């Protein structure tokens, strides 16, 4: 079998074409500023310029003007400071070790290109791996401002290849800054799902605290020492990038949407059906939780308009009730289960709930001394799991269902993902076996059941009162933790036993519905761009007018892509 190329070798190929040598920092900045203009369409530059009022692209912007461009709330000072510094660093590209002395339209335009996957690929030939590095650098604390590197000749290629000499291995991002950034992205994923949608700025930040709770789970995934943010624990690039790639691959998509939002005029923005128009929140399925699911699952989540099938609080906690509500749905579903971790089995079964004692007799639990629980699992009591099942439910007292895309997702206290390794990982057992994901079928007799948990599995008893998540590594139908694989800890053994508080099942649209929705959105975006072109032409003869207005063509020769 062939060898998979390393990230380093791939990145070296991306920028293999040598760049010119220039004699000053200012020349290099001008070079990349002008290159950014060549990547953008004239109509996009004109639309962005219209948002600056009477200012030129090279004029400094105030913090208030910057906040208006990015729709940052006046009340959120921490986010304002974080994003201001973030864009000052990005706008200094390629000199990332020092942030710009001022924020300009040129700097923001360059940021738009650098923070979108397709544009940065055209601009520099960089992959998503380099984009993640760039975002991480923007989030790091940086005290140096406008420090000029002493050199007689700058080799641009060397500056690009070394990211201006930044040592990523020793860089960290504050947990509080990461929490604000992830909270912002989650909020935008619901309110800014496309780059050309209208934003309701009055209510945009109303539920910030709710989104922050969800974001906390994602931040805990980036450093297992973090249980509560604000204790000064740093997040390394290695942990940050692994978390993004392994368990939250879509989390940066809203960043692309909000920066490209600046390339549309207000009149060209389209009404987009917000979640509150078709989703009535429940105890579990809230807008913040939908945002979290969107970071890890396919686009079916929001695009297909989730359908409430079963809510235990409304229909009663029973297998029969769940079956009557769910089994007629002929597409993918999301099972949500949340509860409180049972810390002391003996104390709880003898003093609080004698039914739990019987469950322990039926479920062969791991011994406490054989477990390695991370701090977030030891110290946090609330647990929430989602199971994405890409096949209709059915009674399976002997067999199994669930295609290869079935997966277990831990949503709290941290975010993690456990992927199906083979077809058939779910059972719905109506003769006392309950619901199992990753298990073997339980052995059921007249008045007893014996569960057979898999190495990685989620078990719900037949009364929907108790649940257990088990992790012991490879060997079953569900694969081990995507997070733990990074440090070769995929065989770490732990078990989360919990009292179920809520169970819900939600239907996702089928592939046909999703494809239709995607086609509609692409058509609407194309129409918006077409209207932009028409509006631009009504101003006069296209590019000539832009040059006369000083928008393009007066800042040197534009470069091509690398």
Curated annotation (Swiss-Prot):
Keywords: Cytoplasm. GO terms for cellular component: fungal-type vacuole membrane; nucleus. Residues 283-509 form the TLDc domain. It is found in: Cytoplasm. It holds the Pfam family TLD. One of its GO terms (biological process) is response to oxidative stress. Residues 1-21 are annotated as: Disordered. The keyword tRNA processing does not apply. The keyword Cytoplasm applies. Its main location: cytoplasm. InterPro entries: TLDc_dom. Residues 10-21 have a biased composition (Basic and acidic residues). It comes from the Eukaryota. Belongs to the RTC5 family. May be involved in a process influencing telomere capping. This is Restriction of telomere capping protein 5. It comes from Vanderwaltozyma polyspora (strain ATCC 22028 / DSM 70294 / BCRC 21397 / CBS 2163 / NBRC 10782 / NRRL Y-8283 / UCD 57-17) (Kluyveromyces polysporus). The lineage of its organism: Eukaryota, Fungi, Dikarya, Ascomycota, Saccharomycotina.
């Amino acid at each position: 079998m062939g060898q998979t190329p390393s990230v380093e070798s791939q990145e070296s190929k991306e920028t293999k074409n040598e760049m010119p040598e220039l004699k000053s920092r200012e020349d290099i900045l001008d070079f990349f500023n002008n290159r950014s203009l060549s990547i953008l369409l004239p109509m996009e530059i004109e639309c962005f310029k219209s948002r600056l009022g009477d200012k030129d692209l090279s004029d400094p912007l105030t913090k208030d003007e910057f906040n208006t461009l990015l729709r940052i709330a006046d009340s959120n000072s921490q986010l304002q400071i974080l994003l201001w510094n973030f864009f000052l660093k990005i706008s200094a590209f390629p000199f990332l070790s020092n942030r710009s002395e001022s924020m300009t339209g040129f700097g923001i335009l360059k940021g738009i290109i650098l923070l979108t996957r397709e544009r940065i690929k055209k601009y520099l030939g960089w992959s998503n791996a380099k984009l993640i590095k760039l975002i991480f650098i923007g989030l790091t604390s940086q005290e140096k401002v406008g420090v000029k590197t002493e050199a007689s000749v700058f080799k641009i290629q060397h500056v690009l290849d070394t990211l201006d000499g930044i040592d990523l291995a020793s860089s960290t991002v504050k947990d509080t800054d990461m929490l604000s950034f992830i909270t912002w992205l989650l909020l935008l994923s619901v309110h800014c799902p496309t780059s050309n949608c209208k934003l309701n700025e009055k209510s945009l930040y109303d539920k910030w605290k709710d989104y922050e709770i969800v974001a906390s789970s994602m931040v805990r995934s980036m450093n297992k020492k973090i249980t509560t943010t604000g204790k000064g624990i740093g997040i390394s690039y290695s942990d940050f990038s692994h978390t993004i790639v392994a368990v939250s691959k879509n989390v940066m998509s809203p960043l692309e949407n909000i920066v490209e939002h600046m390339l549309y005029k207000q009149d060209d923005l389209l009404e987009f059906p917000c979640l509150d128009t078709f989703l009535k929140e429940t105890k579990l399925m809230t807008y913040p939780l939908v945002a979290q699911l969107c970071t890890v699952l396919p686009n079916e989540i929001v695009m297909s308009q989730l359908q409430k099938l079963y809510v235990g609080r409304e229909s009663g906690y029973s297998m029969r009730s769940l079956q009557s509500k769910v089994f007629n749905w002929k597409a993918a579903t999301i099972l949500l289960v949340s509860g409180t971790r049972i810390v002391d089995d003996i104390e709880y079964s003898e003093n609080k709930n004698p039914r739990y004692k019987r469950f322990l007799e039926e479920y062969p639990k791991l011994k406490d001394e054989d477990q390695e629980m991370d701090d977030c699992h030891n110290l946090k009591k609330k647990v929430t799991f989602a199971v994405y099942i890409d096949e209709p439910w059915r009674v399976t007292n002997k067999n199994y269902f669930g295609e290869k895309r079935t997966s277990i997702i831990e949503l709290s206290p941290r975010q993690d993902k456990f992927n199906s390794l083979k077809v058939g990982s779910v059972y719905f057992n109506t003769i006392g076996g309950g619901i199992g994901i990753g298990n073997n079928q339980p052995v059921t007799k007249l008045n007893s059941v014996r569960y057979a948990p898999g190495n990685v599995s989620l078990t719900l008893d037949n009364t929907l009162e108790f649940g257990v998540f088990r992790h012991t590594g490879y060997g079953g139908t569900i694969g081990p933790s995507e997070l733990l694989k990074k440090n070769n800890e995929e065989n770490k053994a732990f078990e989360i036993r919990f009292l179920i508080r809520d169970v819900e099942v939600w239907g996702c649209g089928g592939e046909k519905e999703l494809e239709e929705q995607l086609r509609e959105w692409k058509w609407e975006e194309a129409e918006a761009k077409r209207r932009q072109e028409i509006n631009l032409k009504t101003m006069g003869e296209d590019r000539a007018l832009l040059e006369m207005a000083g928008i393009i063509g007066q800042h040197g020769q534009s470069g091509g892509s690398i």
